């Protein structure tokens, strides 16, 4: 858990430099193993209250639990959302000047837990935040053809929406992704209001027509390195 506040060595992908902008939807995400989900949720709510009262610029901070994929049940996440990178770095300085925010919240829970960090972004408006139970299916991918991926992602969104999927389909690009994420340089995700909507969307995605389209237009341009499903706790 001490790694939660340490600076991690990161790599910048050349692909990212071409498509990540100074004004963006930014997600600063911590992947934590060995943490009780309820304790983390409570600590996150307490930290948010202190940080917002202290002038933090983050749009929101939430915690979630991994339901499917590698190490489900033992893996939790803290996601912090910003409108741009400047706000993120401003909050980093603010948190450093107010160490009690961390010490009195996250610092009181399991210090033996391990964590990794990745910062991801895109240049689109930030989607509206959901409530507890919001469900996200994701795949970390190594993009092998940036042009083809960028051309086909909007079409993929249209294909899923036309099929009636009640999910937001989008992607985020690595701004700083460490060894735990690399060689992936992006994440494709489905975001649903609840597990029911996600299940129905996954059924649509698994249909023969959608799979044929994906294998013809998306799969040739990516290598999937990890995938999973998570649900938000707050």
Residue ranges and their predicted role:
Residues 1-7:
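Positively charged n-region of N-terminal signal peptides that target proteins for export
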Residues 7-18:
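Bacterial N-terminal signal peptides
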Residues 20-102, 106-212, 216-234:
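Short S/T/G/P-rich N-terminal loop/turn motif that feeds into the first structured element of a domain
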């Amino acid at each position: 858990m001490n790694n939660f506040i340490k600076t991690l060595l990161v790599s910048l992908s050349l692909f990212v430099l071409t498509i990540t902008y100074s004004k963006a939807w930014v997600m600063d995400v911590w992947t934590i193993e060995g943490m009780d989900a309820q304790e983390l949720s409570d600590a996150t709510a307490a930290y948010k209250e202190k940080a917002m009262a202290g002038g933090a610029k983050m749009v929101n901070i939430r915690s979630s639990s991994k339901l499917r994929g590698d190490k489900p049940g033992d893996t939790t996440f803290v996601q912090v959302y910003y409108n741009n990178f400047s706000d993120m770095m401003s909050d980093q300085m603010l948190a450093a000047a107010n160490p009690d925010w961390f010490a009195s919240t996250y610092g009181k829970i399991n210090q033996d837990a391990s964590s990794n960090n990745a910062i991801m972004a895109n240049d689109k408006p930030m989607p509206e935040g959901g409530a507890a139970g919001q469900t996200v299916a994701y795949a970390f991918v190594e993009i092998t053809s940036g042009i083809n991926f960028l051309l086909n992602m909007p079409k993929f969104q249209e294909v899923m929406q036309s099929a009636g999927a009640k999910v937001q389909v989008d992607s985020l690009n690595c701004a700083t992704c460490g060894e735990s994420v690399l060689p992936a340089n992006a994440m494709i995700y489905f975001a649903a209001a609840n597990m029911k909507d996600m299940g129905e969307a996954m059924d649509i995605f698994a249909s023969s027509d959608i799979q044929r389209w994906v294998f013809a237009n998306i799969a040739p341009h990516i290598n999937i390195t990890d995938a999973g499903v998570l649900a938000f706790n707050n």
